[in-house]
Amino acid sequence: MEKKAFVTKDMIEKIAEKYPTPFHIYDEKGIRENAKALKEAFAWNKGYKEFFAVKATPNPFLINILREYGCGCDCSSLTELMLSNAMGVKGEDIMFSSNDTPAHEFEYAAKIGATINLDDITHIEFLEKTIGYLPKTLSCRYNPGGYFSISNNIMDNPGDAKYGFTTEQMFEGYKILKAKGVENFGIHSFLASNTVTNDYYPTLARELFELAVKLKEETGAHITFINLSGGIGIPYRPDQEPNDIRAIGEGVRKVYEEVLVPAGMGDVAIYTELGRYMMAPYGHLVTQVIHEKHTHKEYIGVDACAVNLMRPAMYGAYHHITVLGKENEPCDHKYDVTGSLCENNDKFAIDRMLPKIDIGDYIAIHDTGAHGFAMGYNYNGKLKSAELLLKEDGSVELIRRAETPKDYFATFDCFDIYNKIDFDA
């Protein structure tokens, strides 16, 4: 698919007068259209709900847009629970899917009524001892092990993942939970990441639906929901095609009718926990070129770095780059596009063919709406950037200010050194 930026050079020049680069900017129109399409794709299931993966983009202004389309929150930590609660997301609208979970996080999840998704069979006893009881509704995360394949193509390796119950543990766990008074059960599974195929969800659904039927038959458990989690990806590269969410929803419906309905389980709700799919395409990291270097390679230095977008440095991930104002110029120059960290992997692109770039140019790095700002950090004392929302009417709203040196040094505020720092630097 063609990768086009949702901002222009003229727009960014105007925005940068008020909000200096680098910054993440999100497209409200795109977010809304996508959320609406997802809701429509699963409208056939009466209980369907998307629990947005807060870890992907933990910004309340963006999450509140999704809430207008019925989305809840998928949380994996205490602070994500705290944020969701502060936003007014309550009870069953929060799914707490965690692993290696500290006791206090279970306590808080139970306190605010979140649905708890257990990652391990030993967590049954741990949860009961921690909060003094077991909730009437609980979910268990399933990991079948081995390789997960679609049409003989290996998609991922669940057997190497730290998450979830084995098949045997699912049956044992359900029996234990039922004996302890749990009344409503859920099944959760995440078996592949960033899949760019319409077949992932239907294939996963078949495996989970068939498991659900067996669990019901062998344990008598009342299964009220099946959570397909995340895994629907996006086309980061121009040579990839996007998923068709309507085809995906229809594929899941067909399997639902084939497997669950004949088993008398036609009332089971379908849940999803999408993050990347909901937000990634609708975010850009906008940065300005501040240096060029001509040595063994041609380098373009920008004012953003891996602090602002970690994925290329951490995973070698591809993020498309648009040189704003030069969209129609030939990509006949080969560059490494770099940040200023003291790490050689701080590169947004390596040997990337781009138009001729000049100091002062603005660059839009695509698909940063999920796992972009969220994965930021402060190595080298670098500060995280602002987040902006491009509204449907064309106006721009600040939805998170940029960090300041005072933020960076805040945890020293109880020590004498804090008062000696020159905050006017």
Give, region by region, the residue ranges found by the protein language model.
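A charged N-terminal "starter" segment
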Residues: 1-136, 175-179, 183, 217, ...
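Conserved, mostly hydrophobic/aromatic
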Residues: 31, 55, 77, 109, ...
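Generic beta-strand/beta-sheet core signal
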Residues: 53, 97, 119, 141, ...
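Flexible loop/turn segments at secondary-structure boundaries
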Residues: 58-61, 83, 102, 147-148, ...
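Active-site loop/helix belt of alpha/beta enzymes
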Residues: 130, 144-290
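ATP-grasp fold ATP-binding core
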Residues: 137-143
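Charged (often Lys/Glu-rich) extended helix/loop segments that serve as interaction or gating elements
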Residues: 260, 265-425
